[in-house]
C-alpha cells in the first residue's frame, strides 16, 4: 500500500508552529490541518491562539471552528475529522500539513489510537472495564506509574491514554495509512518562556479577558472552559485574584503546559527538534520537506 505523505509540525505552545505551517503551505502547495484540541471551538479565538483571519486567508485551514463550545471533542473525533481532511486535501493534489500541540491527538492519528486492526478487542474491553472500576485517585496513580501526561485531565482521557500505553506493541505493528515527516520546533527554555509571557500579554491586549468572561458567564463548566487560557482568569471575575495575579497564573500554567508538551513529543513521537533561533532554521526545515517529497530545489 502506498502511504500518504503528510508533514506534521509539533512543539511547545508559542514556538511559532502556525507561521511555519503557513510558510510550508505556500512553498509546497499545502493546506493546514489544526491538531489543537481547543481550536475546534467557535467563538474561542484569542485564548486558543487560533490562526487569525489574515493567516487563514494566507493558507487554507481545516478543523478550526467545527464545534460549538457546548460540545465535547475527543481524540477519536479528531482522528475521524483529520482522516477526512487529509483525503480531501490529497484528492486535490495538495500536501496535508498538520500543525498542533495536542500530542494525544497527533499520536492517535499517526499510530492508530482507535485500537483496531491487530489489537485484541476483547482484551481492550476487559482492560477498559478494569480501569473504569478505579476511583479518580487510583486512575491518576496509574498515569503516573506509566509516566503519562495528558492535557486537560479527565477520566475519559485518562482511560484512553492508559489503553494506548497498554496496547502499544500491537499498535506499533499495525499498518497505518500515512508516512509522516515530523518536524519539531524548540529552543532554549528561556526563549520559549519569554515567548509564552509575551504571547499572554498580547492576548490580554487583544481581548482575551472579554472572551474569557463571555465563556465564564455562559458556559463555565463545559469542556472548552477547562482549557489553559480561560480557567486561569475565572478567579479574577469573582474577586479571588487581581488581574495581575490571574495573568501570572496563566503564564505559569502555560509554561508548565509547554514543558509537558515537550516531554510527550520526546517520549512518544519520532521527532528531531530544530531551534527556532538558529540562523538557518527556515531553510533547514524547507530542505527537509523538499527531500521528503523528493523535489528538487528551484533555481
Curated annotation (Swiss-Prot):
Residues 36-39 are annotated as: Interaction with substrate tRNA. It catalyses: adenosine(37) in tRNA + dimethylallyl diphosphate = N(6)-dimethylallyladenosine(37) in tRNA + diphosphate. ATP binds at residues 11-18. Catalyzes the transfer of a dimethylallyl group onto the adenine at position 37 in tRNAs that read codons beginning with uridine, leading to the formation of N6-(dimethylallyl)adenosine (i(6)A). The keyword Flavoprotein does not apply. Belongs to the IPP transferase family. Its EC number is 2.5.1.75. The record marks 102, 128 as: Interaction with substrate tRNA. InterPro entries: Dimethylallyltransferase, IPT, P-loop_NTPase. The keyword Nucleotide-binding applies. PANTHER family: TRNA DIMETHYLALLYLTRANSFERASE (PTHR11088:SF60). Pfam families: IPPT (PF01715). Substrate binds at residues 13-18. Keywords: ATP-binding, Magnesium, Nucleotide-binding, Transferase, tRNA processing. GO terms for biological process: tRNA modification. This is tRNA dimethylallyltransferase. It is an enzyme of class 2 (transferase). Its cofactor is Mg(2+). Monomer.
